[in-house]
């Protein structure tokens, strides 16, 4: 796509590794120096391990230099970096998905196991919903002092329209009773 005869492109940047203060600021400094527009950004930090995704729109003229500078900065910071081009059509298709219904499903239990999350996510998938994000809502769980762990809670941000909402609720109620977890 062109703006004022300047050819632009979208690039998805993926950064993973040990998190530290100032990492995002140093990445943004490079992107700002080349006038990149941020189309989307998301970050998760699990046990000091960073997963950062940034979708940028930048002039084709500046894209090579920005990727080179980001690669050097990633090496300096000790993180891994990857780049993927996103075509105009792919980007617009993604934009057009934003009008889909959104739901929040919360999973609560004394502890949460992979088996419980598997059961919930299979129902989500069966209903044709996509998980946009998963977020832990409760504090960190102690393994040395489990008596301090009152409950565990995660939130699924879902997008789409369930194929059968009543059946979905019934299935969630069934696993709630069988697996000692609650949904809201």
Region spans (language model):
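A conserved regulatory-domain signal marking ACT and ACT-like small-molecule sensing domains
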Residues: 2-184
